[in-house]
């Protein structure tokens, strides 16, 4: 489908906000005696977590999880499958899930349920982009980079459209041509 891209968050704005998030996370966890682990939900969060982890100034581990809930279509089936599970044990650790974007919240809700069964000390969420108007599941998000109040397709900074545009240094809105 023919489309154009409109920049909605610049590279500079991303850099400033990721620094701020790193400071907020550092402040929250700096006095904890428990180990901290960041869990990136792949693939969309890979650029965000690589920048964010360097802005968190306390010792932490990093791990990755890949899930799927789409089957063959474009709409989520709600049935979350773990494609790549964690390599590290999260028992008694402060877990911070790092997400690129939260829309309906269905997949993230299932991931939370799965991780809670592994008995972390704490379980928090950091998302680069939050679309609260699209939420279908009640999820408490601890750290939000930017709220997107309109419902449109977003690309860049790790987020793709048909596996394209992940490389963009900014966040863009996909504008479909009629």
Curated annotation (Swiss-Prot):
Subcellular locations according to the entry: Cytoplasm
Lineage, broadest ranks: Bacteria, Pseudomonadati, Pseudomonadota, Gammaproteobacteria, Enterobacterales
Binding site for Mg(2+): 99-100
Protein name, entry field: Hypoxanthine phosphoribosyltransferase
Cofactor entry: Mg(2+)
Residues annotated to bind GMP: 99, 103-108, 131, 160
Binding partners and assembly: Homotetramer.
Keyword Protein biosynthesis assigned: no
PROSITE patterns membership: PUR_PYR_PR_TRANSFER
